[in-house]
Structures are given as structure tokens and as C-alpha cells.
Design a protein with these regions (language model features):
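Signature of the first transmembrane helix
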Residues: 5-63, 100, 104, 129-130, ...
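Alpha-helical transmembrane segments of multi-pass membrane transport and lipid-handling proteins
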Residues: 18, 86-113, 312-363, 395-396
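Short runs within selected transmembrane alpha-helices of multi-pass transporters and secretion channels
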Residues: 20, 59-66, 125-144, 152-160, ...
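Helix-terminus/linker motif at the lipid-water interface of multi-pass membrane proteins
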Residues: 22-40, 111-112, 173-174, 239-284, ...
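Helix-loop junctions and terminal segments of transmembrane helices
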Residues: 59-74, 281-305
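Hydrophobic transmembrane helix module of multi-pass membrane transport proteins
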Residues: 97-239, 243
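Transmembrane alpha-helical segments of multi-pass transport proteins
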Residues: 182, 237-238, 243, 439-495, ...
Length: 509
């Protein structure tokens, strides 16, 4: 593995992801304050119904392009790369146009049965963005394979900037009077943003792929097989999982109503959970998202070259770093969740929900990185099977438990299914990579360090985290102390390993 190139790409992706997350969170906060929790609930339900169409259009194609391009470069056959990408373009366009037709024709029925109100227009507004999303997914896989992450970052930044700018302009000029109008203008911004991103990606792709074009360009003979082996199963599995996820999201407000909440209160609770708390919970994952995506081509190359020791080493380090980061993040949300909710949304209830869901962070982040590692090791079908099982179980439990227990039942379902999914995925990864899980080093010691740093800070007479300065100080100081602790623990563990290594024992004898 080219460590320097990997590190540079990781830094570029992390910084771009961080900027994008800040823009997205700022937009979310502004949008939620305009339409309120109930409006956010309606907005999230529309997106939930739209996600299966996105899965049909994009699932698996990015991974297929990455695998085909890295394989061509590994076999010293770069002249087949343009043909491979073109075939993936064709497949993704076919799937996305099919999804467009189905969603456009079914928008009225879906709105009437599941969404309520005048949601069909907002749902149809998202349809033209599907082909753009499909093509962008192909080019994202290409950029990942050639380590051109800055090109992917530029395209994503252009998308977010266009989406936010157009949505804000539409709100300012047209002043939506209803939640349906607000959702419609937001979906218009999202569709235009996808078009801008696709155009930007295509321009950068054309400029870069020219180096692989020559008079001896040959068709990629393995493209059709790769589409059948990777893209098609992934598309079908992701589509099934997205349908289950949509069903899960539709069942949440329905179950809360059956438990005694009014329709308005149930939609508001759902909007606060999915539209306000969950984005905060996933916000720090931008530091891991770039890392997880870069692992796919690196692990694919190691697998193709038979570098088993490299696979084991990278897997162990990835899991350790993920848990170090996620344990600290979870502890921070538990300690300061209420204040963070007040700072971002001016609502203590959102902060309290953030505290209750904070222990999920290690499970969510570990699942993200484990999924990337499994895909790189050609275990994507296993990963999809586990995710589909998880989604099916959630839907069944939502239908049975939520009407009886309300939000408490929802939390129980999230934790139990999260533990099951991570256990299955992690067990498969450990077996494939040939390593064992180090509970003391990866979980217990980080938990102890995070507890000491964050607990100590919370007892000091410092500005409240509900103020911007207080949050910055808390993150900087507790994070710095935690890094020092982690560095010290690493040095001690390395010294112990050195003392008890085979070379040291032989020398002593």
C-alpha cells in the first residue's frame, strides 16, 4: 500500500467531507427552524419513499467501476478502462431511467397511501435527478480507483453549493406558505444540485480518462461478468433493503400514533429523530467516511496480489482507529447532548434524544468501516445479506413493538438490531482477514480515557457547550487530552510487545 498517497487522499477527502458536512448541517438547522419538527417529518418521509429509486439507479455500480479499473491497472491493461466505464454508464442509465418511469407513474398513489397531503409534486421533482445520480456514482467509482479523490470532492462540493444556494433563493423569492411548498422547493434544489455535480464530474472524468485512450483501445472483456457478479446482485439487494428501510420509516409515525400520539405529534417526533438528531449523530463520521471509501481499492489490490499480511494489518488498524474515534464521540454526546441540542435546534428534547442514542455511535461507525473492508475483500454479498436481514428484522419489530411501547420500543429495536448487524459483519471480517478482536485495547482503554477526559472537563468552570465558544473549547481540549492518552497507551503497548517478542525472549535465554 502506498502509504503517502493513501494519507494524502484521506486528508483531502476528510477536509472536503468536513466542509460539506458543515454546509449540510447549517442548511439542516436553517431548514428545520423554518418548517419545524412536523415539517421535517414530512420531508424525511418523502426522502424515504424516494430512496428505493436511488438504490435501483446507483447501488453497486460505483464499486463495480472501482474494481474493474483497479483490476485493469493491476494487470497492466489501462487501454480497457474507457470501455469498462462506458459499459457501467450504460447499465446505470438503463436502471435509472426504469426507476424514473416507475416513480413518476406511481407518485400520486404513493403520496395518497403513505405520505398524505400534496406530496406527489415534491416526489416527482426528484425524478429527473436519478440519471444524474447514476452517472455520478460511476464516475465516483472511477475517481476512487485512480486515487483522484480531489475530483470527486470538487463535484460533491459543487452539488452541495448548488443545492443549498437554489433552495435558499427559492425560499427567499417565493416564500413557501405550506410544508408541501417548502418540500417542493427543497427537492428542486436537490435535483439541480445533482445535475451540477454530474456535469462537473463528467468534465473532470473526460479530462482524466484521455491518458488511457489510444489507438490500441480494447474492450473490457470482464465488464459484463463484473456487472452480473457485483452490480446486479448489489442493485437488487440494495433495492430490497431500501424498500424495507422505507417501510421502517413509514411505520415509525404510524406506530407512534397507535401508541397514543396524535398524527401531528407522531410526525413531529419522527421528524426530530430522523431529520434533526440522526444528522447530528452522523456528523462526526465524515472523518471515517473518507477513510472507509479509500479502503475499498486498497484492500482489492491487496486481495488480488495475495498480500494476506497486509490485509490483516490494515484491517486491525482500521478497526482500532474506528473504535478509538467512535467511543470518544459517543462519550461526548452522552455528556453534552442536551447542550448540543439547545445550540443547534434550541430544543432540549432534541438534545435528550441525542444523549439516548449516543451509545449507538460505535455500532454505526464500526458498521460503516466494516462494510467498506468487506467490499474490498470481495465479501459484498455477505455484507448485503447481513444488511438485508437487519432491515427485515427492523420492519417486523417496528410493526409489533412500536404500537405497544412507542419511542422506548424504537430505541430497543435500534440497539438490538445494531448489535446483531455489527456482530455478523465483524465476525465475517475477522474470519476473512485472519485476525482477532482486541477488547481491552480497542474498547476498554479508549472508554476509560474518553470518560476521564470528558468527565473531567464537565466539572470545570468553563463556558457551556450550548454556546459556540463552549463547544469549540470542549472539543479541542477534551480531544487533545484524549489524543495524548491514546498516544501514551500505544507507546506502552508497543513497549510491552517489544519486551515479550520472540527476538527479546531468545536474546534473554
Amino acid at each position: 500500500m502506498k502509504k503517502k498517497a493513501f494519507f494524502i487522499n484521506a486528508v483531502i477527502l476528510t477536509l472536503s467531507s468536513l466542509v460539506g458536512r458543515f454546509l449540510y448541517m447549517g442548511f439542516r438547522v436553517w431548514f428545520s427552524q423554518l418548517i419545524g419538527p412536523e415539517g421535517m417529518g414530512a420531508y424525511q418521509l418523502i426522502l424515504s419513499v424516494f430512496l428505493p429509486a436511488v438504490a435501483i439507479s446507483t447501488a453497486g455500480v460505483s464499486l463495480t467501476v472501482t474494481r474493474l479499473v483497479t483490476s485493469a491497472m493491476g494487470k497492466k491493461q489501462p487501454e480497457t478502462i474507457p470501455s469498462a466505464v462506458a459499459r457501467c454508464f450504460g447499465f446505470s442509465l438503463l436502471m435509472s431511467l426504469t426507476a424514473c418511469v416507475v416513480l413518476w407513474l406511481g407518485a400520486d398513489s404513493l403520496s395518497e397511501k403513505f405520505l398524505g397531503g400534496n406530496s406527489a409534486q415534491a416526489l416527482r421533482m426528484l425524478v429527473p435527478g436519478l440519471p444524474f445520480m447514476a452517472l455520478s456514482a460511476c464516475m465516483r467509482g472511477y475517481f476512487l480507483a485512480v486515487r483522484g479523490v480531489i475530483r470527486s470532492a470538487v463535484s460533491e462540493f459543487a452539488e452541495q453549493l448548488a443545492t443549498i444556494s437554489l433552495t435558499v433563493a427559492a425560499f427567499w423569492l417565493l416564500s413557501p406558505k405550506t410544508v408541501a411548498d417548502a418540500c417542493l422547493y427543497s427537492m428542486l434544489g436537490a435535483t439541480v444540485g445533482e445535475g451540477v455535480s454530474c456535469g462537473c464530474s463528467f468534465l473532470l472524468y473526460r479530462l482524466h480518462v484521455r491518458r488511457y485512450r489510444s489507438a490500441q483501445n480494447r474492450p473490457c472483456t470482464g465488464a459484463g461478468k463484473a456487472i452480473l457478479h457485483i452490480t446486479l446482485p448489489s442493485t437488487l439487494s440494495h433495492a430490497a433493503r431500501s424498500v424495507l428501510s422505507a417501510a421502517e420509516n413509514l411505520l415509525i409515525p404510524l406506530g407512534l400514533r397507535k401508541c397514543g400520539a396524535t398524527a401531528s405529534a407522531a410526525l413531529a417526533q419522527y421528524g426530530m429523530l430522523q431529520g434533526m438528531v440522526m444528522p447530528l449523530l452522523f456528523f462526526p463520521s465524515c472523518f471515517l467516511g473518507a477513510f472507509a471509501s479509500l479502503l475499498i481499492p486498497e484492500m482489492s489490490e491487496s486481495l488480488a496480489a495475495g498480500k494476506n499480511r497486509s490485509i490483516a494489518s490494515v484491517t486491525g488498524r482500521s478497526l482500532r482507529l474506528t473504535l478509538l474515534f467512535s467511543v470518544f464521540t459517543a462519550c461526548f454526546f452522552v455528556a453534552f447532548g442536551r447542550e448540543i441540542g439547545v445550540l443547534f435546534y434550541r430544543q432540549e428534547e432534541a438534545g435528550e434524544l441525542l444523549r439516548l442514542l449516543a451509545p449507538l455511535v460505535p455500532l454505526l461507525y464500526l458498521d460503516m468501516v466494516t462494510d467498506g473492508l468487506l467490499k474490498g475483500l470481495d465479501q459484498q454479498l455477505r455484507s448485503l445479506a447481513y444488511n438485508t436481514l437487519d432491515a427485515s428484522l427492523r420492519v417486523a419489530l417496528m410493526a409489533g413493538i412500536l404500537p405497544l411501547m412507542g419511542l422506548k420500543g424504537y430505541f430497543c429495536i435500534l440497539y438490538s438490531c445494531g448489535i446483531l448487524n455489527v456482530t455478523l459483519s465483524l465476525s465475517r471480517l475477522l474470519k476473512t482477514a485472519g485476525i482477532r478482536f482486541r477488547v481491552m485495547e480497542w474498547v476498554v482503554l479508549p472508554l476509560l480515557g474518553a470518560g476521564v477526559c470528558i468527565g473531567g472537563w464537565s466539572m470545570l468552570p468553563v463556558p457551556s457547550v450550548s454556546q459556540p465558544l463552549g463547544l469549540i473549547l470542549a472539543v479541542t481540549c477534551t480531544g487533545g487530552g484524549y489524543l495524548l492518552y491514546v498516544s501514551g497507551i500505544k507507546a506502552v503497548l508497543q513497549k510491552r510487545k517489544g519486551l515479550f517478542s520472540r527476538h527479546s525472549l531468545t536474546k534473554a535465554i
